[in-house]
Swiss-Prot record:
N-acetylserine carried by residues: 1
Pfam families in alphabetical order: Globin
Biological process (GO), any one: hydrogen peroxide catabolic process
GO molecular function, one term: peroxidase activity
Protein role: Involved in oxygen transport from gills to the various peripheral tissues.
Intrachain disulfide bonds: none
GO cellular component assignments: blood microparticle; haptoglobin-hemoglobin complex; hemoglobin complex
Family: Belongs to the globin family.
Gene: hba
Protein name: Hemoglobin subunit alpha
InterPro entries noted in UniProt: Globin (IPR000971), Globin-like_sf (IPR009050), Globin/Proto (IPR012292), Hemoglobin_a-typ (IPR002338), Hemoglobin_oxygen_transport (IPR050056), Hemoglobin_pi (IPR002339)
Tissue-wise expression: Red blood cells.
Record's keyword annotation contains Transport: yes
């Protein structure tokens, strides 16, 4: 579980990341589709799956809006993300293993875009947070 220090570190890092959230999200989604091609199945309705395509950028923005919500609900992720969990489980039918894949891609992008801020401590805290988000999003699958 997230400690108070983890939460404070995530909130501080998010304060910097949020200014570039759309770019982070687009890069993370684009990276996921390229590095983990099995994830393309969820986006087969898009005419263009290239990393810089408008659909990838739009979905990246959507993902980061969800992360912003998670940061705001950091004290109760399970209830705070319940609606998103239901949407992913019942409407989109996303395999919850993909949450971890996208989380990893986000960590890579954030490390690349924010090397000064992405300290080992920040890395651990953000990784724990994204794991907690993945778990909360998996809630309705049970």
């Amino acid at each position: 579980s997230l400690t108070d220090k983890d939460k404070a570190t995530v909130k501080a890092l998010w304060g910097k990341i949020s200014k570039s959230a759309d770019a982070v999200g687009a890069d993370a989604v684009g990276r996921m589709i390229v590095v983990y091609p099995q994830t393309k199945t969820y986006f087969s309705h898009w005419p263009d799956l290239a990393p810089n395509s408008p659909h990838v950028k739009t979905h990246g923005k959507t993902v980061m809006t969800g992360i912003a919500l998670a940061v705001s609900k950091i004290d109760d992720l399970t209830n705070g993300l319940l609606e998103l969990s239901e949407e992913h489980a019942y409407k989109m039918r996303v395999d919850p293993a993909n949450f971890k894949i996208l989380s990893h891609c986000m960590l890579v992008v954030i490390a690349t875009m924010f090397p000064k801020e992405f300290t080992p401590e920040a890395h651990v805290c953000l990784d724990k947070f994204l794991c907690a988000v993945s778990l909360a999003l998996s809630e309705r699958y049970r």
